[in-house]
Amino acid sequence: MFNCIEGVENKIFHGINLKYYSNKLEDLKIFEEIIKSRKIMSRNDLIKMRYEHFECLPRIYEQCENEICFAMHPKNKNFSSVYCNDDSLSAFYEYIRFNISFVFLESILNNGYSLQDGGEIRIPTSLDIDKDLVAIGCFDEIEYLLEKVNRGKSKNVMFSEQLIKCEDIHKYISEKKKRTYIIKNLLKKYGYNVPIIDPLTGNIIDSNYEKNIEDVKLLKKVLIKNI
């Protein structure tokens, strides 16, 4: 049983970023609509189908009515020239961090794309997701923050207020597990056989996996100290 997907740094990501939605639709609802339709749609296509939540669409779609926005992995060497030294300013962290994402093979770029600053990629068409989808990404926030702390870089980390303010670590982890479980069930419901991964590392996330409580308590102390 493998525990990660190979070559995650060469994959292309499309993320559900709730900060672009005007009335904060639940990302699980948007996720289900996408996997049910089996298509990531451009603004034009959403207009044609009279998309129920059109008024709540991300502003990002207004950049071009036919484009869809993606992000490359910050370790993608083929496009490293468009990244700045601060990973946190990249499209990957802007669109993928804390959000559900769709992970695709690089072959989705074969029909043309435009490359923007910060590792953003725009594809000039709607995308059928069955062919090139290899995984669903759920950012493993705790693993990411622990790795930063262990490397002595906690002062520069983009901490999570949700984690810091959470009084009950067990409840926090339980909610993370519940979310992964819901995503896994939705994938099964609509006939998808792809893993759920941490998009940064490619590690497969098991809905039964529980982070070490003491590690998370230590992490909270470090983050609070550096606010």
Predicted regions and their residues:
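NAD-dependent ADP-ribosyltransferases
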Residues: 1-227
